Curated annotation (Swiss-Prot):
Protein's gene: rplA
HAMAP family registered for this protein in UniProt: Ribosomal_uL1_B
PANTHER family: 54S RIBOSOMAL PROTEIN L1, MITOCHONDRIAL, LARGE RIBOSOMAL SUBUNIT PROTEIN UL1M
Pfam family, one: Ribosomal_L1
Protein name (record): Large ribosomal subunit protein uL1
Database matches in PROSITE patterns: RIBOSOMAL_L1
Swiss-Prot/TrEMBL GO biological process terms: regulation of translation; translation
Assigned protein family: Belongs to the universal ribosomal protein uL1 family.
Keywords carried by this UniProt record: Repressor, Ribonucleoprotein, Ribosomal protein, RNA-binding, rRNA-binding, Translation regulation, tRNA-binding
Molecular function as annotated in GO: rRNA binding; structural constituent of ribosome; tRNA binding
Job of this protein: Binds directly to 23S rRNA. The L1 stalk is quite mobile in the ribosome, and is involved in E site tRNA release. Protein L1 is also a translational repressor protein, it controls the translation of the L11 operon by binding to its mRNA.
Length: 220
């Protein structure tokens, strides 16, 4: 991630203005935040992960797949899940006959063992249902509604950086700021107990094709 000239640091509102003004692609660029945390990501107890609902959404449709059986399938369909299926769907995925083009996968606790058979397919894509994200639940309708309203997941990488989408360049600065604050709040709540002192080292915002913009420290 390259910085703008002289590594200039902006206040968050000016930073968003710079990112939006610099977006010149012939498509609607996403706006992302990258947060460098003061953590040792090699330690399992210092990995930061979680999920948060963006109050202003993502600016695009969030797609959901549901693995379940019986009445739970009907509930998922009524809740407008994009892909719904049972063991047959799992077999299609194993045979690569189903393109799972979704953002989230959900299942019910009693069907989790079946979904585990495709963990090697879902896991690398970050799609494996996880109780921590409320994607293993009997309350599928509620979970689908929350996710489609703009829920995202976040996870620190090997360098201790959290990347998250917070909208696109057509969003107002006020809407981007609300989403940004929601992500920051969720990351603060996920702060490992072992981390002392400064938590946020550097914060950058960037559009899909633009240069990153460094914004002021969040530790003040």
């Amino acid at each position: 991630m390259s910085l703008l000239a002289n590594d200039e640091v902006y206040d968050i509102v000016s930073g968003f203005k710079k990112v939006i003004e610099s977006a010149k692609a012939n498509f609607c660029e996403s706006v992302d935040v990258a947060i460098n945390l003061n953590i040792n990501s090699s330690k399992s107890d210092e990995q930061v992960r979680g999920a948060v609902v963006l109050p202003k959404g993502l600016g695009r449709e969030v797609k959901v797949a549901v693995f379940a059986k019986g009445g739970h399938l009907d509930a998922a369909k009524e809740a407008m899940a994009d892909i719904v299926g049972d063991e047959e769907l799992i077999e299609e995925i194993k045979r690569k006959k189903c393109k799972l083009d979704v953002d989230w996968c959900l299942t019910t606790p009693d069907f989790m063992s079946s979904v585990s058979s495709i963990a090697k397919i879902l896991g690398p894509r970050g799609l494996m249902p996880n109780p921590k994200f409320n994607t293993v639940t009997f309350e599928l309708s509620k979970a689908i509604k929350v996710i489609k309203s703009g829920q995202i997941r976040f996870k620190s990488d090997k360098a201790g950086i959290v990347h998250a989408k917070i909208g696109n360049v057509k969003f107002s600065i006020e809407d981007l700021l609300q989403n940004f604050n929601a992500v920051i709040g969720a990351i603060k709540q996920s702060k490992p107990a072992s981390v002392k002192g400064v938590y946020f080292k550097d914060v950058f915002i960037v559009s899909t094709m633009g240069k990153s913009v460094k914004v002021e420290s969040l530790n003040n």
